[in-house]
Amino acid sequence: DYIVGTSMGSIIGGLYAIGYTPQQLDSMVKKQDWTFLLSDRIKRSQQTMSEREKSETFVLSLPLTGKRFKEQASGGVIKGQNLANLFSDLTVGYHDSIDFNKLPIPFACVSENVVNGKEIVFHDGVLSTAMRASMAIPGVFTPVRIDGMVLVDGGMKNNYPVNVAKAIGAEIII
């Protein structure tokens, strides 16, 4: 058995590969605060008083000049740190650079390097980072930068990574 995914498939596939059951995944999806996860907000309990006052003033604030504007204009509206934190929490025990073939179910996920347009297949590395890179939808989430690469959602290059599954030895592909 192998699991290969891109975008949301990399998240579900990566978590399933390390042992989460379909019931656990379903429960996780239902209990998440998606408004928080799909934002760059900091939990109120972790904010300073001035941050609380500022966050309660506007529903949405986007800078129109400066470094932060350039980052958002060239990347995505959402940095994705809250999602990255969730992925990190869910993959405890798999934070070191690891061989994804040695997971309980061998796993690979796909991303695209926008610097050169090449498909990047993660067979190893930090699982949560690979998952985050594979779902970095351009314009929505900032790309993930690794070793000079600027990585975005794998679905931009290979939405159905059947070729990757075949390359690692899968015979029956669902």
Regions found by a protein language model. Name each.
Residues D1-T6, L15-I174:
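Patatin-like phospholipase
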Residues I12:
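Acidic, glycine-enriched active-site microenvironments
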